């Protein structure tokens, strides 16, 4: 759950509890606060509403404002093209492929992304259930959002999509906000995104729990991101 959104939503209804009984007014307040569009307000509990808002915030940011910076990463950027191809993979999954920059460069690649039309499949990772498993995966900034239970569930599902011996490449965020210093005040579209605070201990503990080998962990060359590589058993 995105606690930044939850706390703001709680603040809104604490100040104006009538919003809980006025769905249209609540919808307008949410749209104005989070700069998103909601067709209707239907939820059984506050956590469900928070998840809907969070998904809309991510959709708005990655569809309309996010810019790729693949060339700026020493380890988790374009270097991966040769590294992945050297594995001779039968199938490769790019999780959260964005503009699908590796398409046509990495062999046998399938790109999934819920927010970008360039993807082969417009689907979230947890909703991706292919008929065949993968020999390699890329998750270069896509498993970065939400609480620990969500991040771990995505890691667990990614591992489940892999054949034995598959190599999994990751770039993760240690909890730093995206730099939008060039935008006017009030137009920082990543304000409401919760960036998960990855660290080496979490990576090691997850690897142990998911029964995968760690091949590499290092800090990449741009924005303090962490690059790591797993291999399934």
Give the location of each predicted region.
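Alpha-helical scaffold elements within enzyme catalytic domains, especially in hydrolases
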Residues: 157-160, 205-206
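A short, conserved alpha-helix within the catalytic core of class I
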Residues: 145-157
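Short glycine-dipeptide loop
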Residues: 162-168
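A conserved beta-strand element that flanks and buttresses the S-adenosyl-L-methionine
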Residues: 138
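Class I (Rossmann-like) S-adenosyl-L-methionine-dependent methyltransferase catalytic domain
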Residues: 2-128, 169-233
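Hydrophobic adenine-recognition pocket in adenosine-nucleotide-binding enzymes
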Residues: 142
């Amino acid at each position: 759950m995105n606690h930044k959104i939850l706390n703001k939503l709680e603040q809104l209804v604490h100040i104006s509890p009538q919003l809980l009984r006025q769905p249209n007014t609540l919808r307008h307040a949410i749209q104005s606060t989070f700069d998103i569009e909601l067709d209707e307000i239907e939820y059984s509990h506050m956590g469900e509403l928070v998840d809907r808002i969070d998904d809309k915030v991510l959709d708005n940011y990655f569809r309309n404002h996010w810019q790729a910076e693949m060339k700026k990463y020493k380890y988790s950027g374009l270097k991966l093209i040769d590294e992945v191809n050297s594995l001779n993979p039968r199938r490769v999954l790019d999780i959260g492929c964005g503009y699908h920059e590796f398409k046509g460069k990495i062999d046998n690649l399938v790109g999934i992304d819920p927010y970008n039309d360039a993807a082969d499949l417009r689907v979230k990772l947890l909703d991706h259930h292919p008929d065949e498993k993968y020999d390699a995966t890329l998750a270069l900034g896509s498993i970065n959002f939400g609480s620990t239970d969500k991040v771990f569930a995505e890691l667990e599902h990614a591992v489940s999509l892999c054949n034995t011996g598959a190599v999994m490449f990751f770039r993760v965020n240690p909890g730093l906000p995206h730099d939008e210093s060039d935008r006017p005040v009030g137009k920082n579209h990543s304000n409401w995104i919760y960036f998960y605070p990855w660290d080496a201990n979490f990576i090691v503990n997850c690897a142990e729990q998911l029964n995968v080998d760690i091949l590499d962990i290092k800090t990449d060359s741009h924005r303090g991101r962490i690059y790591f590589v797993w291999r399934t058993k």
